């Protein structure tokens, strides 16, 4: 998600258009008995005891690691109790808030730039000029823009996945969007709402998507290998296959794929995830705004169901980058595909269904550069922020937790039909077919008493029928394609913009960042126990910011520590706020050393289980500080208690009380600021090497709010008078120790 993003002609945030008008209320530490590499990658793995696996790939999807747990053996006499592990302790002094155009880390740490917008990832590609004149034909072999969620996959000498590797790996990262001002000589060339320079649009096609790059540690320094055979870009022109219940249905038929079996590209890839067989999941978030659909001319050609779906997903604009306006079109429709209006005689003559081909979780095999990515439709279509893998247990289903990143949207989970078999480690896309194409999709209802229920999204249950008043569901494909409408019907709880998800490997608790909301989406009379605050976060210039502009983090524990359970308990782990705010706003008692706003990226370390990293994507507190990264040591659901807070709408002389459940205040021992980024950036995406001694962090869109290409407000990372660039930094501890401890 991008807080400081561009707006349309009406001042509407292109990445933050709420469309929910429903009446709904609002693998642990390195295992001692690790499999041998021989077993891990294909011989005898089915008889394994345990094997370390990545979960939630880096930043909400992150490299939190869980063991594969075998079926329980017969009871045996209880052994003598093991010594209690030494509690984790944050081992750095908090970094002060900052408005400087630099990356600030604690004393004793070094942050080095690793991978910047435009950097070449193939032999023979010239260094990036960063002046808008690089050959557009080379951009499919360059780093994309707006670096986001990422995962580190360790690689062994046999070029296979080795989660413990600390010196060589594949860094796989999303490129969410673009800052077009800095991509061309003088920004985008637009004449009366029409893009007139096709080469500019070609650049932009390639700068979205995903990078796969090989990285290596040489001495104490990390670098990426420009000519690695693993290096790959996946972008808006990459062919993708559909799998799952929506594949090869009428909903996905287009001129490009007349049988609905494939499409091109992925974009607005925000958070991410991983699988226990060693593939990467990238998640399509704010995709709807890229499509052109003019309501005044297209609505009359659509059915009532289509109009309901368009309204719920926000497909009604000229297209945020105006890609559909380029003429002439290419023979294969590279520009025309972004026009989702009815033009031809049937769906196979145009791209009227083009919008349905986005909004999915996409699986990519980083170890096979020639493999075709797959859009896994069983996980539902919405504004996917991430897909965080839950605890992995042999003989049990796999579970992924997901947020829908828009105001008043929902939290979901997918439970596979097939039970996990460790023999599938290294199984690539075929393993994905087995576990991700058939399962149960659920949405969360948070009740006012601190409990909750998972509601299944399935035709014929939970009001998801052909008789639902807002939308007549027809079949299983209709349900997953219109998952938001299905969740409305089921009665899910509207949340304050669900973002990244992360699972604590020590407790199994699931954390979800709710980055913020405004007064229009969450007025004082519409708060709930799980979204309890309404307040005015006044800036230092006394500007009012109403609603819940600072956000919070909710967490829940599935019943009986079973991710497949249909009930859970919840509380609010952390309320973001200025340290100077009132007690009814600063409910987590934050201080100058750990106050924050708009939590977004989130990831649990696998090298130090229980260590949580939090990243911000903020526009509310940027009068005081740039966005930041914090380290935390959270407890567990229920470590605090019930609380009654007082919300105030001073402008309308309204005061209301709201019950909620607040986690234990973290204090500076349990939460402190670790890094502050450069001007106008977002901190997003995080991963670590197999030993936890290198931390990879993404700095997205520094200087995005610049008004002029010749006078940017940031020059990071290259300095001088250069244009700013999104980039990955690698952080190491000068004494070689674990990061953060």
Label each PLM-derived region with a short phrase.
Residues 61-78:
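Short, low-complexity, disordered segments immediately C-terminal to signal peptides
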Residues 1-35, 46-51:
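N-terminal secretory signal peptides
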């Amino acid at each position: 998600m991008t807080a400081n993003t561009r707006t349309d002609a009406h001042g509407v945030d292109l990445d933050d258009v709420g469309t929910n008008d429903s009446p709904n209320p609002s693998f642990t530490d390195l295992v001692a008995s690790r499999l041998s590499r021989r077993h891990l990658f294909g011989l005898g793995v089915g008889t394994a005891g345990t094997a370390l696996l990545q979960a939630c790939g880096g930043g909400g999807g992150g490299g939190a690691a869980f063991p594969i747990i075998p079926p329980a053996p017969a009871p045996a006499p209880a052994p003598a109790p093991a010594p209690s592990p030494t509690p984790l302790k944050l081992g750095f002094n908090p970094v002060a808030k900052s408005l400087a155009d630099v990356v600030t880390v604690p004393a004793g740490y070094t942050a080095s730039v690793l991978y910047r917008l435009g950097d070449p990832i193939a032999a023979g590609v010239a260094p990036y000029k960063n002046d808008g004149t690089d050959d557009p034909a080379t951009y499919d072999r360059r780093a994309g823009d707006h670096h986001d969620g990422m995962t580190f996959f360790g690689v062994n000498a046999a070029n296979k996945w080795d989660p413990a590797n600390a010196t060589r790996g594949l860094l796989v990262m999303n490129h969410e969007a673009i800052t077009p001002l800095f991509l061309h000589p003088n920004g985008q060339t637009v004449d009366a709402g029409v893009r007139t320079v096709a080469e500019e649009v070609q650049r932009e096609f390639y700068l979205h998507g995903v990078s796969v790059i090989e990285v290596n540690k040489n001495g104490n320094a990390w670098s990426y290998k420009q000519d690695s055979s693993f290096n790959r870009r996946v972008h808006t022109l990459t062919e993708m296959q559909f799998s799952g219940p929506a594949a090869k249905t009428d909903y996905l038929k287009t001129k490009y794929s007349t049988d609905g079996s494939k499409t091109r590209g992925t974009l607005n890839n925000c958070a991410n995830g991983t699988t226990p067989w060693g593939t990467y999941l990238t998640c399509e978030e704010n995709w709807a705004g890229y499509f052109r659909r003019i309501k005044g001319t297209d609505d009359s050609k659509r059915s009532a169901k289509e109009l309901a779906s368009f309204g719920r997903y926000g497909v009604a604009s000229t297209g945020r980058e105006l890609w559909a306006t380029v003429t002439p079109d290419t023979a294969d429709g590279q520009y025309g595909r972004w026009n989702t209006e009815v033009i031809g005689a049937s769906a196979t003559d145009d791209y009227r269904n083009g919008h349905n081909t986005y909004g999915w979780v996409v699986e990519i095999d980083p170890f096979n550069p020639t493999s075709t990515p797959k859009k896994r439709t069983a996980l539902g279509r919405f504004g996917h922020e991430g897909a965080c893998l839950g605890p992995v247990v042999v003989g049990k289903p796999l579970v992924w937790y997901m947020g829908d990143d828009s105001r008043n949207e929902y939290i979901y989970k997918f439970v596979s039909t097939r039970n996990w078999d460790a023999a599938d480690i290294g199984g690539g896309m075929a393993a994905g077919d087995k576990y991700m194409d058939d399962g149960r999709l659920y949405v969360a209802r948070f009740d006012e008493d601190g409990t909750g229920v998972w509601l299944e999204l399935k035709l014929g249950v939970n009001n998801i029928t052909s008789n639902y008043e807002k939308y007549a569901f027809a079949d299983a494909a209709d349900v997953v394609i219109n998952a938001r409408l299905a969740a409305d019907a089921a009665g899910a709880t509207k949340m304050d913009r669900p973002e990244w998800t992360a699972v604590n490997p020590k407790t199994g608790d699931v954390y979800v960042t709710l980055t913020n909301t405004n007064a229009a989406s969450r007025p004082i009379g519409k708060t709930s126990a799980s979204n309890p605050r309404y307040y005015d976060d006044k800036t230092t210039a006394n500007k009012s910011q109403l609603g819940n502009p600072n956000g919070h983090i909710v967490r829940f524990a599935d019943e009986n520590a079973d991710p497949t359970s249909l009930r859970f308990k919840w509380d609010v782990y952390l309320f973001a706020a200025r340290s100077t705010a009132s007690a009814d706003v600063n409910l987590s008692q934050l201080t100058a050393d750990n106050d924050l706003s708009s939590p977004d990226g989130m990831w649990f370390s696998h090298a130090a289980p229980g260590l949580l990293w939090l990243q911000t994507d903020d526009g509310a507190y940027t009068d005081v500080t740039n966005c930041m990264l914090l380290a935390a040591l959270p407890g567990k659901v229920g470590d605090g208690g019930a609380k009654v807070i007082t919300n105030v709408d001073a402008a309308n002389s309204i005061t209301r009380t709201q019950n909620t459940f607040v986690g234990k205040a973290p204090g500076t021992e349990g939460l402190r600021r670790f890094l502050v980024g450069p001007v106008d950036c977002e901190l997003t995406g995080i991963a670590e090497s197999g030993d936890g001694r290198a931390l990879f962090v993404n700095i997205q869109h520094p200087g995005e709010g610049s008004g002029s290409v010749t006078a940017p407000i940031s020059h990071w990372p290259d300095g001088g008078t250069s244009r700013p660039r999104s980039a990955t930094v690698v952080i190491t501890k000068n004494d070689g120790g674990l990061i953060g401890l």
